[in-house]
Each structure stands twice: as structure tokens, then as C-alpha cells.
Amino acid sequence: YKDNPTAKRIAYRTEFNQEPKEMQPSNVVVDSIIADLKRAEILLTNIDPLNFEFPKTEDGNGGTGKDGFLEYRHKRMNLYAVKAMLARVYLYAGNKTEAVNYANQVIDGKYFDLIGDATDVLRSKEIVFSVYVDKFDQQVTDITNGTSYLIVKESFLNEMFDVANDGTNDLRIREGVGFDYGTNGIKMRKYKQENLWASTEGTVVLIRLSEMYYILAECAATPGEAAEFLNKVRNIRGVDPVVCTEANRLDEIEKEYRKEFY
């Protein structure tokens, strides 16, 4: 997009039919995505019930006795998921002003919190948008039982989480939280369905609150300001503060994306 915004890349559908659709230039696709999201924002404002809670126990109607469809809004396309996606696409398009605007709206909405609770494996209060996958536990079991799911070399994991600089206190790399460490290798716990609350089972996270801080870091006016946004997440994850310079800022942001979303 940045290097050649008028080059034709993908088709973008605005109608539900089987008719062939011509490839569209990148800038047209981005404009279309923004237009769709802005329309969704208008439609959801003052309509979305904004119920964002994963109870530890639940009844058949989402844990509150209310209509289950109106609960667990982070399992559906909700108003703040739309705002978060606008922050994403505006950053991609190079419009940092609007990227900051929408990232801050998600953070300042006070519906989500960064949490460091190791017992909440999915960090449910951070989930802005996710999807529910039926019988996901069976699919995960089939995948994780084989050796192909193993990380054989611990050195790879250490590089991924920058252990040489950050140590092993990071919540995301700890035994029983982020990974299981065994004699045959290391297994990622990202999709494992063990020890989850009933309300979080089958949940695949698509947008986390932490991403909004990373967007703000990339848009920050100075390296010091960028470091402040990164450190808000690092502090919750149990990692010491990082210092950013003009030379390393993007590298440090990339490292945090990698650790958070691996």
C-alpha cells in the first residue's frame, strides 16, 4: 500500500452474490474498508449493549439470566471492535492522527483492562473482539497431541521473547501460563482448553487491548513517549521497562507484537 497504493491487489465485495468482482487498487480497498467500518460505527453507536464480561460461572443465558445474544459482546462484532479495527486500518494507511484517535477511544472507553492474573489464561478483560469456535477443544486436542506442535528448541523461544534482555519473568512465557515445558519439547498453551472458565471455552481472540497501546507507540511523537506506551503492557506482563531511541523504536515495537501475539 505504502509503495504503490494504486496497484490492483484484491477484490473487495460490497454485494452478496456470485458475480465475479474485479481486482481493486490498494487505496480503493482501504477506503472501502474505512467506509464500511465508519458505517458500522454509526449503526452500533447507542445500540450496542456493550456487555463485556466473562463470568467464572454461567447459566444458559450467558451468566446473567439475560438474552445470551446480547451478552459477551466481545464474541461478536461490537462497537469497540469496530473502533479498534479503524485504529488498525488508519495506521496501515498512514493516517496516524485517526489511528491515535480510535486507539484512545478503545482505551478510554473503560470497558477493557490490561491484567496480569495468571489464573485468567485468556486475559479475558483485554479481549476487544473474538469468535467462538464450536467443539474447539476437540480440534485443539487433535493438533496438540502430535509432535508437530512442539517447539523443540528452547533457544527459539528465548529469542522470540528476548530472554537475554527481559529474563523469564514475563507472564507470557511462564510454565503453565504461556507454555508447557516437557522433556520432549515445549508446547504453546495459546489454544489449549484446559483450566478455562466455562464462558471462555472455544474463544479465539482476534483483537486485544494491548494492540491499541502498540498502535499509540508507533504513532508517538518521540521515542520516550513510545516507550511509555510499550511499558504499560510490559509492566502488566512482569517485564522491566524498555528504553526506546530513534534507532530502535520500531524494533522494540515489533518485539512486543511478537511476544504478545505469537
Predicted regions and their residues:
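Acidic/polar-rich alpha-helix caps and helix-coil junctions
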Residues: 1-147, 164-262
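Aromatic (Trp/Tyr) and acidic
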Residues: 149-156
